[in-house]
Swiss-Prot record:
<dbReference type="GO" id="GO:0006310">
    <property type="term" value="P:DNA recombination"/>
</dbReference>
<feature type="region of interest" description="Disordered">
    <location>
        <begin position="109"/>
        <end position="178"/>
    </location>
</feature>
<feature type="short sequence motif" description="Important for interaction with partner proteins">
    <location>
        <begin position="173"/>
        <end position="178"/>
    </location>
</feature>
<dbReference type="InterPro" id="IPR011344">
    <property type="entry name" value="ssDNA-bd"/>
</dbReference>
<keyword id="KW-0235">DNA replication</keyword>
<keyword id="KW-0238">DNA-binding</keyword>
<dbReference type="GO" id="GO:0003697">
    <property type="term" value="F:single-stranded DNA binding"/>
</dbReference>
<comment type="function">
    <text>Plays an important role in DNA replication, recombination and repair. Binds to ssDNA and to an array of partner proteins to recruit them to their sites of action during DNA metabolism.</text>
</comment>
<dbReference type="GO" id="GO:0006281">
    <property type="term" value="P:DNA repair"/>
</dbReference>
<keyword id="KW-0227">DNA damage</keyword>
<feature type="domain" description="SSB">
    <location>
        <begin position="4"/>
        <end position="108"/>
    </location>
</feature>
<keyword id="KW-0233">DNA recombination</keyword>
<comment type="subunit">
    <text>Homotetramer.</text>
</comment>
<dbReference type="InterPro" id="IPR000424">
    <property type="entry name" value="Primosome_PriB/ssb"/>
</dbReference>
<dbReference type="InterPro" id="IPR012340">
    <property type="entry name" value="NA-bd_OB-fold"/>
</dbReference>
<feature type="compositionally biased region" description="Gly residues">
    <location>
        <begin position="111"/>
        <end position="159"/>
    </location>
</feature>
<keyword id="KW-0234">DNA repair</keyword>
């Protein structure tokens, strides 16, 4: 029987992203995202909140985008998979489970995010397109949030914004009120 390793998180960053580069030149960005569960305490009848913190790792072009546009407090949607790392420290085995991001959508208003595409609608993925050079060479696209394996056989390389059809509203700068 097939198995599934899929995680979807919507939450807020607890700190600015930390980006570093591997010897190969590929970017790695780590973030911590808080999600809050609200529930009614059965004993007291009071509303309670429980916050969970999630470590998320981005790789390649997606890491560069996350490092550039996400900031502390930013709301973000992330799809990915769980990965557990193991190492030894002082003779003791240590474990850490994190989310390896495959797709990211920046949420919230443009005022809370820096730069173009920071508002709702900044969807990016690892973009493993055929002909795109493999892991880090795919195209990151703004707008709809491309999922893994999509994107056709276009040229790999840098990120490009997907051009939306012209509808005569290019000059409108207002945020949508809902």
């Amino acid at each position: 029987m097939a198995s599934v390793n899929k995680v979807i998180i919507v939450g807020n960053l607890g700190a600015d992203p930390e980006t570093r580069y591997m010897p190969s030149g590929d970017a790695v960005t780590n973030i911590r995202v808080a999600t809050t569960d609200r529930y009614k305490d059965k004993a007291s009848g009071e509303m309670r909140e429980a916050t969970e913190w999630h470590r998320i790792a981005f790789f390649g072009r997606l890491a560069e985008i996350a490092g550039e546009y996400l900031k502390k407090g930013s709301q973000v949607y992330v799809e990915g998979r769980l990965k557990t790392r193991q190492w030894e420290k002082d003779g003791q085995k240590q474990y850490s489970t994190e989310i390896v991001a495959e797709q990211m959508q920046m949420l919230g208003s443009r005022q809370g995010m820096g730069g173009e595409g920071g508002g709702g609608g900044g969807g990016y993925s690892r973009g493993e397109s055929s002909g795109g050079g493999g892991y880090g060479g795919g195209r990151a696209q703004g707008g709809g949030g491309m999922s893994r394996g999509e994107g056709g056989g276009g040229q790999g390389g840098g990120a490009r914004r997907q051009q939306a059809p012209s509808n005569g509203f290019e000059d409108m700068d207002d945020d949508i009120p809902f």
